[in-house]
Curated annotation (Swiss-Prot):
It catalyses: 3-phosphoshikimate + phosphoenolpyruvate = 5-O-(1-carboxyvinyl)-3-phosphoshikimate + phosphate. GO terms for cellular component: cytoplasm. One of its GO terms (biological process) is chorismate biosynthetic process. This is 3-phosphoshikimate 1-carboxyvinyltransferase. It comes from Mycobacterium ulcerans (strain Agy99).
Length: 431
């Protein structure tokens, strides 16, 4: 699945100038798969998806739906979802390292009439899941286990009702419950009881997509979501390009002083990663919308910066790479990201370790990182089987000759084409 050979990160001695097309959004693809599955399971009919991302995370979601007895047809970015929830005996769902599968599929499995066992990669066993399982128990769903592996004993239906959950470790707890809530007999009310929610815009994305499927959702009260019971409308879904994956390429323009154009950039996206544009503009970058494309022209130089990434934690590795490559001596403070300690790896510890390994100066705080830009040296950059860490290493390698990413294959989680796209971007600029 992942490369075991170190990957020499391409060095860019001159500004990068490139046009890049990134595949569909992982967040949208996996949400549309679940919504399409629920519509089919209710007997409402089949749904189609175009622009779907095909990567390890989305393939794991497809396999999870198929394990539950649903049909997902199509081999590329065009998919059709149909069928009913009829799992085979001794059904097992492999979550891999995909948080969306780990947290979106169990409420769906609760609607089955059979036991479903969930497991995943070794690193996935450290990812937070207990609050979601406790919430399912609170809704009357028998669940064995407090973490991977665990078993959901479906009874064919879920009564629904009101459930309190501390989602401060992951907004996906809320999204996972909301996605299936309309299929519960009495609907669902979710009340967040913990500290400030991370990645709240991802919940807003879930709510918007539920409404597009005809679901009545009331989110007028902060930290409370009410999903009324009802049918999900089968429909055609069109996934936007994955803006989080695009961020690494935009960062290439910033750190090299070049120009990168992303094709198909949506004019009004529901993806939280669109907020990267505000960050890039504070770094003296020029952002232009040209027809259906987004173009970022990097500056000659930029200084350190302060940014709260609570709503866009997925951007942290790329933003940390930007901070490490800022003008020497300048300081960046990345805040609001304590929850990243429970992502694919402890991203705060990983970023601090890898930046410092190359001679940088990165310190952890209670909720983030403080990075003082210093000249970096060649060396190995560990990915920790984390796609975003691998991409961050590639960004650093643009300005530091001799950086090797130990596992660039980790990018297959959300962008299998990353090594090829990255190399083409750099090599296409060298002439």
């Amino acid at each position: 699945m992942s490369s075991i050979e170190p990957w020499p990160a391409p060095f860019a001695p001159t500004p990068v100038h490139a046009t890049v097309t990134v595949p569909g959004s992982k967040s949208q693809t996996n949400r549309t798969l679940v919504l399409a599955a629920l519509a089919a399971a209710q007997g409402q009919g089949s749904s189609t998806i175009t622009g779907a991302l095909r990567s390890r995370d989305t393939d794991l979601m497809i396999e999870a739906l198929q394990t539950l007895g649903l049909r997902v047809d199509g081999t590329g970015s065009e998919l059709t979802v149909s069928g009913r929830i009829r799992p085979c005996p001794e059904a097992r769902v492999d979550c891999g390292l995909a948080g969306t599968v780990l947290r979106f599929a169990p409420p769906l499995a609760a609607l089955s009439a059979a036991p479903i066992t969930f497991d995943g990669d070794e690193q996935a066993r450290a990812r937070p899941i207990a609050p979601l399982l406790d919430a399912l128990r609170g809704l009357g769903v028998p669940v064995d286990g407090a973490g991977l592996p665990f078993r959901v004993q479906g009874t064919g239906s879920v009564a629904g009702g009101t459930v309190a959950i501390d989602a401060s470790a992951s907004s996906q707890f809320v999204s996972g419950l909301l996605l299936s809530g309309a299929s519960f007999t009495d609907g669902l009310t979710v009340q967040h009881t913990g500290s400030e929610l991370p990645s709240a815009p991802h919940i807003a994305m879930t709510v918007q997509m539920l409404r597009q499927a005809g679901v009545d959702v009331d989110d007028s009260i902060p930290n409370r979501w009410l999903v009324r019971p009802g049918a999900l409308r089968p429909r055609h879904w069109d996934a936007e390009p994955d803006l989080t994956n695009a961020v690494a390429f935009l960062a290439a323009a910033v750190v090299t002083g070049g120009t990168v154009t992303i094709t198909g950039w949506p004019a009004d996206s529901v993806q939280p990663a669109k907020n990267i544009l505000d960050i890039l503009q504070t770094l003296n970058s020029t952002v232009r919308h040209i027809d259906s494309c987004l173009q970022v022209q990097g500056p000659q130089s930029y200084r350190g910066f302060d940014v709260d990434l609570r709503d866009v934690g997925e951007l942290t590795p790329s933003v940390a790479a930007l901070a490490a490559l800022a003008s020497p001596g300048s300081v960046s403070r990345l805040a609001g990201i304590a929850h990243l300690r429970g992502h694919e790896t402890d991203r705060l510890a990983a970023l601090s370790t890898e930046i410092n390994r190359l001679g940088g100066n990165c310190e952890q705080t209670s909720d983030g990182l403080v990075i003082t830009a210093t000249p970096l040296r060649p060396g190995s950059w560990r990915a920790y089987a984390d796609h975003r860490m691998a991409m961050a290493g590639a960004i650093v390698g643009l300005r530091v000759a001799g950086v090797e990413v130990d596992d660039i294959g980790a990018t297959s989680k959300t962008l299998p084409e990353f090594p090829q796209l990255w190399t083409e971007m750099v090599e296409g600029s060298s002439g």
